Amino acid sequence: MTLRLSRTTTLAGAGLTAAALLLTACGGGSTTADPAPDNVAPVAPAASGAPAAASDINYEGTLREPATTARAAAKDKKVVIISAGQASISSSVPVAAAKEAAEAAGWQTDVYDVQLNPANAPGLVRQAIAAGADGIILQAVDCPGVKGPLQEAKAKGIEVVGIYSFDCSDPIFEGNDPPLFSGQINYGADAAEIGKFTEKYGADQAKAVIAATGGKAKVIFFNSPTVTVLNYTGKGFKDEIEKCAECEIVAEVEFAGSELGPNLQQKATSALLQHPEANAVKSPYTSATLLGIAPAVVQSGRASKLYVMGGEGFAPELDLLRAGQGVNAVNIAPSDWTGWAAVDTMNSLFAGTPAQDSGLGWQLVDKDNNLTSNGPFVPKTDFKAIYKKAWGV
């Protein structure tokens, strides 16, 4: 039975503040895994047909090199990056990367800050238009909340690309509005657009949970449903859990971004008390892990009996993983790489050519696999060098 601890609110507009607290934020072939982290019960043999073997954990990941096709950087362009909230690491990291990439391409670049207040977003889009922007990159700002200004931008021929942002035509908004984004990051043939990409990301998180619990996952699932991208990652996760005959989501805990901290920790504590049968926890994003879920897991005294799938895997969450403090694994889709991919997409739009494969995917990280000794995750691919060479800069 699903336990809901708060009520879902509308997706459009209201989710921007919480969206700024996260990235998403995805399925490749199986690979033989190293031993599971030592604070997780050993994986039991899987029943025939059950996706529960340790070899089903995709430690190889799905990151690959971006397309190397030559695509010269456009000349004399001005780009405005609109951040959902620079006070949040989930916004500041990809935005800084996009700014770095745009400047490497030789473009004049400005960053506007919505400051975690959705009411500021329409005015900032109009400010970018008035400033003579050739392109606008929206970070965690969905189309419905800025529909009017985007229509104005489109009328002026301004190119628009999103970073973890969803167009007005996205099915999740349940309308028939035409798209207002000029293009989107190319996530590859298997997940060409962000909805499919993020569903697959969530599915791989679930596969790791299923394998770590021997095909008998009993999951407390946390989500912030006003955030569009989390509905996609959540769907991918839950759909994969449903394929497992002996797995179940025993509690679904919904929360708003404003509840991060003591309120979320209390919800997590209550869910853990109400579900002693739970052996797994799913966090939707890093801030939720840090500001509620991981502390509740540690204080429950059950950390050694729970497999906790964390969020995006920013450096503070990796520190918890290294210390065994309420996080067992994270699935990382590198946000700095995403910022560069957004600029590459913008460059293709300026040239009137299709967006090239970004190479973006994700990397599962746990205590024994793919974890650096300290600091943030560093992908093996030097994506910056590849993009610069392709742009001729």
Predicted ranges, named:
Residues 25-37:
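Bacterial lipoprotein signal-peptidase II cleavage site
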Residues 34-77, 334-393:
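Hinge/cleft segment of the Venus flytrap/periplasmic-binding protein
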Residues 45-97, 101, 110-123, 127, ...:
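Extracytoplasmic "Venus flytrap"
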Residues 81, 132-140, 159-164, 220-221, ...:
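Periplasmic-binding protein-like
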Residues 115-180, 286-293:
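Beta-alpha junction/loop-to-helix N-cap segments that form part of ligand/metal-binding clefts
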Residues 138-155, 231, 237, 256-320:
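Hydrophobic alpha-helical
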Residues 149-199, 218, 315-323, 327:
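Flexible loop/hinge segments that line or gate small-molecule binding clefts
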